[in-house]
Structure formats: structure tokens, C-alpha cells
């Protein structure tokens, strides 16, 4: 019964034991004491002593509970003790085992069990002192390579852990005094194995090694080499205490015996160091000497043999009681969560084998998954000893929703608001308020469109510049009733067609004037009249009308129509009607030259328009004799002359004579040219127009018939020679034929000529709008040389009673002048300078009519001829 009770109590205590944490709760100090003649205070040089605080509370700790202090990067405890008690006030509350890591694990540990001294109403606190050395590598094993990067020279933080409680302190480690480029030697004692780890690295070759042989031998020393523990590799770096931090394979050949190990290698790249290490057993000797083989050839250098010997001090194992015991290391898988090292009970008197057992937890693999949620969950799939358990970690993640808003700042901000209770977080994006935009459309010379956006800083105004190719333009000329010209431009949207509408004055309402001619009987006279002008005009056309017959004014019945027909090379048909009480007559124009004689024709492109009341006034615009341009209703040629003939209608005739001067026609034949010459003085203020390449025209306009009631022409109005006028279109500057620099070239815009005939005391103004057809007039050479470009028209003064008169022509050149400017029609009475020499054998001269320098008609009344007669008597 008693035995059953004891067994039951043991089972209950085991079943109720638990793992507690947080017993070691403070890192009070960490100091170093030189345990030998070490030249520097390195982490692997003994002895480092840590003072750790602990506390046990009976409320949470019970007998049999366990707790552990893990000490990462600690190599071994520097003591012969295998355990230590936690004592307070002379009482032991826990017993702890000292588990050195050595080459087995990356950490040492202190594992403790609460004793029965601890009761529920007891609380104990105290400190424990632990001597040890740190592990910073020293071989090619996985444990040493991991620990080779635990610390660096200088200030470091050392941290120990008791479950989820961590305690830390800082420490200052000194760097090795051996140059890293020199050969490196190391021997470390493994107390639990009574062995030493020997490491060798040859000198550094900065550019790499071509070949070499490295190794060591224990021949003659009694020490043996464990070939199963040999590591060979190359490292791409050393830590501050000259231990390899990595191990990579390379091309080598290894030879190992119980007394020596040799490694021959080739082609080690730059930046790498070859090394070899092995466990050495050195028992029953106080010291032993090692022979090191060190032969190497650096890249680009000759082979070097730097082999040497070195003596290491050994020690005797005091635990076995006898030397030469066998130490067996076994590994056993347990269900614990940490790895532990334990020594099985050993009696040196009876046991020859000391067993060190490594308790390794069941290996586990961790699988991390994720889900939309808030908390992290863990689940473990257990496995029996010898298999691998699985730990599944389910990590939550949140989805996000983005909210964008505007603000007055100048930058974009993004803020994530994490929801602690839900899986949806909010991302708030604040963007600057948009700038206002101004769009400008402009035209440029390219054939394609572009859009440029200029973004201003926040708070400014953005600009969008649209560049469009230019629209095509269609120009239309229209005629209207106003007396002035206008130009209207209609700009279409991009891609359309712009329109330019030019409205010019239509001459359908040409005005007329009334004049009564008186017949004066005056003797033959010869004289000159000079009228000085005070106003200059831009254009000058001089014509003289002489030897007008006596006639009386009478109305002429004209159809109410106004039709101007474009002409061909040989003829012109003109019907002019009466509007607003104005009367018109049809006029036939005769052109004469020495080669072809006189023909009733008009050059192509010319327009004849006439208006009259009691006195018939004919205005002829002559242009484009070579047929290069066509005129239409209301248009004028860019070059030409304007002549005005005034006559009084007489008895109508039923037929237009086709052969002037033939018997029975009533029209005298053309007289022979007069030898008298008309001269023109220079007009002050007249424009100096350069010579042009246009041929002047000699033009004679003959009024020899009237218009009947139905528009047909009648018989000649008088038997006297026809009214003859002549206008020089162009002439060379200061030439004999154009000394006054006068020209008849049209320079205005296209349109009809509006002739305003004022009373006899006023001046009628003829304004010739220009056109843009660029027509050129071809003249006749009246000197008998035929057609000649560049000749100046000759004024033919036809004398009365078959009195001859002739003026030879002079050749000159010039250019046509044309423009599209519009000139208005204006009636102004201004005296002009006009030098005119008149020679006549007629006794009766009713009236003379001339163009002044500005193109106005000057009608001289009867009293002027009386004055001329008186002057001729005196002279």
C-alpha cells in the first residue's frame, strides 16, 4: 500500500509539472578576466562572467516546474562544474544544469528545475554567476559558421532569453591583433569531448591562388587526428577574429591519416581564402608540437614554401579518473521544444565510457498561409519521433478601400487607416485641388494640329494651347449700290474655309450732267492757256477735245437698261440705259493705226460705259489689248486709259455708216494727220511713276451718231470731223511724250468707273478703281512702224476743213501698275495746271473740254473762247 501511494504521488507530481518563464529577469553585469596570456579582450578568450538576477514565486512556481536560460553565441562554461543551485538564505529553490554548446549547438543553456523547497506562500530572489566564453566561429562546421557573425569588434549587445523574457547588456570586444592577411592558427578545447579543434589558413593572395598545399601533422607527438571531422573549404571573408564566415566548395585533393591531413588545391579566385580544420585528441601529454605544411603560389607570382611548426599545450581530463576514456556522443529525438545536452551518470571507478546525450526536439517545418482577417493563428500537426512535425501559421491581411479627396495643399498625401476590428483598411489620398484651365486656339504655319498643356503650380492656372493649321481662304468680289468699297473677312472654325468678301461700287447709277453748247464764230487763232493748280492728284490723264461743231441740246430716248458686254478682239456691243432720269447713248469707238487703218473695234477686256442728258458724254476704259485678261460686267482692267467725249445729239440716223467718209454717209472721211503738235507742260505735284513695260495705246473715239428710241444708232450728228481724244497710258519719266509724268494706268480696286459731270464751272472727277487681273495693254506705233511694244501713244489733233496735223510718236517702255486697294469716288472742284497749246483753222469753235491732271473734265464755256479770240487778234 505504501509503495502504491509513493508511485501515485510521483505520477501526480510529474503530471502536474509545467514550464514556467521569466525566472531569469535581469542582466546585472558582464565582465572579462584574462584567464591566460591573451593579447586582447576578444569574445572567444576566457573568461567572461555574467551576473544574472532571478526570482521564484510560489504563487506561479511549483516543485517540478522547469525553466531555461538560453545563451546564444556562448561557446562553453569555463568551470569544472556541471550544475549550479539557485540558493537564497541558504535554501536551494532550484537546481540548474550547465549545458555548453561547444560544436553541438549555436547556444549554451542553463536548464533548471524547481525543488520542493518552493511552497505557495514562498517567494525567493537572488543572483547567479556564470563564467563562460563566447563562440565567434573557428571551423567549417555549420555551428561555427553561424556563430562567426554573432559579433563584431567594438560595442555589441548581448541578449539572453528565458522563454518570452529577454535580458540584455552591452559589451566592448577588441579586434584580433593578428593581421588577417597573415597565416591563421587556432586550437580550441572541447571539454565534453576532451578534444581540440585545430584550424589553419595560409597567407592571403589578393589576386587569388594558382595552386597550393596546406595541412598539418601530429607525427611523433602522441596526438591523433579524427579524419571524420575534417572540414575543407574556401571563405569569401574573415570576421574580426580571423575566422571564416562562409565555406564554399572548390577544386582540391584531400589526404588524411591519424597523424596528418594534407589538401592540394588549384585556382582559388581573388577574395577567397582556403582553410582546413580537424579534431585533435591529445591525451597523456602536457604539450604537443604540430608540423604545418604551407606551400602556395599566388596569381602572377612564384610558388612559396612557408611550412612551419607550432607547439600547443594540452591538459589532462580530471573527470574520468583515468586517461584514455572513450567519450560517446549520442543524439536522441524528444518531444521537447528545445535542444539540450546532458551527461549520463558515470562512475569512473566502474564505468569506462562516458556518454554525452544530445536531446534534440522533433524537427518541424513551418508553413505560412494568409487569409483576410484580423488575428494570427497557429496550428501544429504532430509527428512521432523520427518524423517531421508541421506548424501552420495563418497570417491575416487586410483589404483596402481608397478614398480620394481634394485639399488646399500643394502635394499629394496618402494615409492608411488600419481597422483593428475589421479586415478592411481605408487608404485616404488627398490631392491638390485642380487648377483652372484656359484654352487658347491659335494658327501656325505647319500642316498639322498640336495641343500643348502647360501645368502651373497648385493655385495657378493651367494653359492648353491648341495650334491649328491655317484655313484655306476663298475671296469673293461682289458689287453693291454704295459709293464705297468694303472688305469682310469671315473666319471659320479650324478645319473650315475662311471667306473674304469684297464689295465694290456698282456703276449702274452713273450720274450725268447737263451742258449746253453755244456756237461761236471766231477767227482762226493760235494760243495757249495755263491754269495753275493748287491741289495735286495721284493720277494724271490729259486729253483735249477740239473743233466741236455747233449744236443744240435735245433729249435722247434711251431704253431703260444698262448692259455692258465683254468684248472679243474685234468688236464691242454696248447698250446703256437711263435710270433715275438719266439718259445714255450708245457709242462706237474707232481705233486707228498706220498698219491696219481705222477699225470699229475695241481691245479685249475693255468696258465702255456712257451717260448723257442733252449732251452725250462717253467714257471709255481701255485695257488688255493683247487678250491676256477678260473683263466682265462692272470690272476694269489693271491697265488702260480713260477718255471722255462730249457731243450734242443731232438728227438720228437709221444706219451706222460702215465706211466713214464715203459719199452719202454723212460722215466725212478721216483727215490727214496734222503737223501741229500738242505739248503738255509738267504738272507740279504729279507723281513720278517709273517707266513700265506696257505698250501705250493711241486711241481715237469718234462720236458720229446717236441712239434711237429703241437703242439703234442713227445717222451722224454733224458733218464735221469727229471728236478725237487721245490719252497716253504710260510713258518714260520726263520723256518727250510724257513730260508731266502723267499716266493712265489703273491702280485702284476692281469696279466700274463712276463719272460725275458737274456744271461747266466745276470739274468732274473720274476715279478709276484698280483690279487685280494684271492685264497688259498693247499699243500701236503711229509713226508708221507697225506694232511696237513700249511706244508712247501719239495725240492726233485733227484739224478742221481738212487741215493736216500730225505728231510723231516716241518709243518708251514701262511696267503695268496694279493693286487691289479700293478708291472711293469723290467729286471735288480744284483748278489744275494744264498747259495746252491749241491750234485751229476753224472760225467757229463752240466748246473745248479737257481732262485735268487729276482726271476731271474741264469744260470751258463760251466766254473763254471769246477771250482766246481776242488774244489771237493781238498776237
Curated annotation (Swiss-Prot):
Q: Which GO biological process entries does UniProt record here?
A: cell adhesion involved in multi-species biofilm formation; cell adhesion involved in single-species biofilm formation; cell-cell adhesion; hyphal growth; single-species biofilm formation on inanimate substrate
Which intervals carry biased composition (Low complexity)? 549-578, 627-641, 722-746, 789-816, 827-837
- Kindly list the places in or outside the cell where this protein is found, as annotated in its UniProt entry: Cell membrane; Secreted, Cell wall
Q: Which Gene Ontology CC terms are recorded? A: cell surface; extracellular vesicle; hyphal cell wall; plasma membrane; side of membrane; yeast-form cell wall
Result when mutating residue 125 to M: In allele ALS4-2
Q: SUPFAM superfamilies this protein is in? A: Bacterial adhesins (SSF49401)
Q: Where is the signal peptide?
A: 1-17
Record keywords: Cell adhesion, Cell membrane, Cell wall, Disulfide bond, Glycoprotein, GPI-anchor, Lipoprotein, Membrane, Repeat, Secreted, Signal, Virulence
For region Disordered, the annotated ranges are 546-580, 619-837
Q: What SMART domains does this protein's entry cite? A: Candida_ALS_N
The cysteines joined by S-S bonds are 73-150, 96-112, 205-298, 227-256
Composition bias, Polar residues: 674-715, 755-764
- Tell me how this protein sits in the membrane: Lipid-anchor; GPI-anchor
Q: Changing residue 198 to S: what effect?
A: In allele ALS4-2
* Function statement: Cell surface adhesion protein which mediates both yeast-to-host tissue adherence and yeast aggregation. Plays an important role in the pathogenesis of C.albicans infections.
According to the UniProt entry, the note on domains is: Each ALS protein has a similar three-domain structure, including a N-ter domain of 433-436 amino acids that is 55-90 percent identical across the family and which mediates adherence to various materials; a central domain of variable numbers of tandemly repeated copies of a 36 amino acid motif; and a C-ter; domain that is relatively variable in length and sequence across the family.
| Similarity annotation | Belongs to the ALS family.
* Identification of the protein by name: Agglutinin-like protein 4
Q: Which organism is it from?
A: Candida albicans
